Curated annotation (Swiss-Prot):
InterPro entries: RNA_pol_sigma_r3/r4-like (IPR013324), UPF0122 (IPR007394), UPF0122_fam_protein (IPR054831), WH-like_DNA-bd_sf (IPR036388). This is UPF0122 protein CPF_1968. Might take part in the signal recognition particle (SRP) pathway. This is inferred from the conservation of its genetic proximity to ftsY/ffh. May be a regulatory protein. It comes from Clostridium perfringens (strain ATCC 13124 / DSM 756 / JCM 1290 / NCIMB 6125 / NCTC 8237 / Type A). Belongs to the UPF0122 family.
Length: 112
């Protein structure tokens, strides 16, 4: 299957666009690390049906991301945050508590 971390992130971003069954299967496979056989048993279906559903969902999630570009936007925000924090640490005599506060606020902006 595809990069587990990448798909897990796409599930976080676009999981609400999947059906409940699709979301549950994808979560079990990518986030809970259950095998195809275990998921098939839970859903009372075949291993092949679960495999096919996962492949379809991966394509669907990638399609959403190609159109909405949410993962690229979030990656860019994290890069900007890292650049800002590097500059703060390099050029500033700010107190560590203030740096931590700024870091937390930047994280809130990214996740808003």
């Amino acid at each position: 299957m595809e990069n587990r971390f990448e798909i897990s992130m796409l599930i976080d971003y676009y999981g609400t666009l999947l059906t409940e069954k699709q979301f549950n299967v994808m979560t079990l496979y990518y986030n809970e690390d259950l095998s195809l056989a275990e998921i098939a048993e839970i859903n009372k279906t075949s291993r092949q049906a679960i495999y096919d559903l996962i492949k379809r969902c991966c394509k669907q999630l990638h399609s959403y991301d190609e159109k909405l570009k949410l993962s690229k936007k979030i990656d860019k925000r994290y890069r900007i945050k890292e650049e800002l924090m590097a500059e703060l640490n390099k050029n500033s005599n700010l107190d560590e508590d203030i740096k931590k506060y700024i870091d937390e606020k930047l994280e809130e902006i990214i996740n808003a």
